[in-house]
Structure formats: C-alpha cells, structure tokens
UniProtKB/Swiss-Prot annotation:
Gene: Pfs16
Designated name of the protein: Parasitophorous vacuole membrane protein S16
Protein task: Involved in male gametogenesis. Required for exflagellation of male gametocytes. May play a role in parasite transmission in the mosquito. Binds to the mosquito vector midgut.
Cell compartment(s), UniProt: Parasitophorous vacuole membrane; Vacuole
Membrane-topology descriptor: Single-pass type I membrane protein
Length: 157
C-alpha cells in the first residue's frame, strides 16, 4: 500500500467527516440553547399563565347558556382547561424539537456509515488491485522466463 497517497486521502475524508458532523449536529445545539436575556422563552412551564388572557371564568359568567356563540365560549374557557391546552402545546413543541434532533441524528449516522463504507471499500479495493497486479506481474515474469527457455531450446537445434 502506498502510504504517501493513503494518508492525504484519509486526512481529506476525516476533514469531510468533521465538516458533515458539524453541519448535521447544528440542529442539536440549537435545540439545547437557552433563551437570551432580552427575549422571553417561547415555551412556558406547565401551570404558568401568560397574563391577562387567562382568567378564571365562573359558572355564571358565560358560555352557551347566556346566548354566546361557540367562538365566544371558547374564549372564556375555565382556567384548568386553558392550562391543560398550554401544557399540551408545550409538550407538542418539545416533541417536534426532539423529532427534528432525532431526524438529524439519523441522517448524520447514515452519512458516517457511508463515509466509513467508502473508506473500507477503497482500502479493500486497493489491496485487491495490488495483489492482482502482483499476481499478474509474477505471471508475466513466469511467461517471460518460459519464453526465454523455449527460445533457448529452439536456438540449440
């Protein structure tokens, strides 16, 4: 194996692998970043309220029994219902982020496997080619040796 050609190609593959890993794992880093000082977090903790939009609605304060439409009654849901909806939304957002991270991990694993297979197939192919060339060279030397022996026998007669 020609080490002078193999080491630069291996170094190039490792640089490519590091670059692909950096690009594909960027989403994982973004998912773990905390919110900045100036911007509030978009995900609220379960049980927290966002201010004036959440207020307790008593049994006599609204709903379809007072002639309000379905849309108006949805705006005046009980506090427990609104908190449950907020919790479901936050869990949904968290699952979406985890799905994105998992998708990127699967893609990066697939890319890593392809790179390793390319490296291994290149090494195996190089060794097979080298042994085949060595066998061909050995066979050519044997043929040349046989031809010179036959040529010597033909000259004697």
């Amino acid at each position: 194996m020609n080490i002078r050609k193999f080491i630069p190609s291996l170094a190039l593959m490792l640089i490519f692998f590091a670059f692909a890993n950096l690009v594909l794992s960027d989403a994982n880093d973004k998912a773990k970043k905390p919110a900045g000082k100036g911007s509030p977090s978009t995900l609220q903790t379960p049980g927290s309220s966002s201010g004036a939009s959440l207020h307790a609605v008593g049994p006599n304060q609204g709903g379809l029994s007072q002639g309000l439409s379905g849309k108006d009654s949805a705006d005046k849901m009980p506090l427990e219902t609104q908190l449950a909806i907020e919790e479901i939304k936050s869990l949904s957002n968290m699952l979406d982020k985890k799905t994105t991270v998992n998708r990127n991990l699967i893609i990066s694993t697939a890319v890593t496997n392809m790179i390793m297979l390319i490296i291994l197939s290149g090494i195996v192919g190089f060794k097979v080619k080298k042994t085949k060339n060595a066998d061909d060279d050995k066979g050519d030397k044997d043929k040349d040796k046989d031809n010179t022996d036959e040529g010597d026998e033909g000259d004697d007669s």
